[in-house]
Amino acid sequence: MSIENWMWFCAIEFVLCLSPGPSVLLVSSLAITGHRKSALIATLGVLTANAGYFLAAVLGLAAVISVSIDAFNIVKWVGAGYLILIGSKMIIQAFSHPESPLIEPSPLKALSQGFVAQAANPNLIFYFSAILPQFVEPTSSAWIQVLVLGVSSLAIEGLVLYLYARVANAVKQASTPYVRNILNKVGGGMLLGSGILLSMMKKSQNGV
């Protein structure tokens, strides 16, 4: 793979990762409520789900999912329901205990939240299936190129989520107690909204 092709892939990945999807909203909501550590752990969960979808795309499992609308909907609705549940809990706690900081999730829970938020978007497997052939050159080892693209994709996603978490946490730290309570509600609302948006998502027809 040429350096030019790799740079184009990284540029496309970076722009797409900047889009505020469920994983961005989850990590930002955790960071904006003061749980920076949980936000970083949730990022690992997101990357784990991404790695799974990337591997599935390489193995050709997109064809299996594409003919099974039931499998797509099950994954989507489970993820959407989970995001709506934790978002609602955050909002309820913020209203019922306005002076108290939100309870930080355990590392395992934060990891699972990140994984579910990303895994709830099965369209990722179609995206990877569509974009990989555009950058894998037939003159070089396909597996090495796929490995480079996969590692690059995860690194870019991790960097973008880390930057979102840093910015959100900085806003939280610079706020007054009153504003922090508002941010707690905003964080819950972000998750609630992302769950609703996810439930409205339709299966991609063009792989992107």
At which residue positions do the language-model features occur?
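Short, strongly hydrophobic alpha-helical membrane anchors
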Residues: M1-N5, Q205-V208
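Juxtamembrane transmembrane-helix termini in multi-pass membrane transport proteins
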Residues: I3-N73, A130-L149, L154, A165-A168
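Residue-level hotspots within pore-lining transmembrane alpha-helices
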Residues: V15, S19, V116-N123, A155-L159
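Select subsegments of transmembrane alpha-helices in polytopic membrane proteins
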Residues: T48-G52, L111-L124, G187
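Hydrophobic alpha-helical transmembrane segments in multi-pass integral membrane proteins
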Residues: A56-V58, A119-S129, L191-Q205
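Selective transmembrane alpha-helices of multi-pass membrane proteins
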Residues: V67-S96, L154-V160, Y164, A174-V208
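Flexible cytoplasmic inter-helical loops of multi-pass small-molecule transporters
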Residues: I92-K109
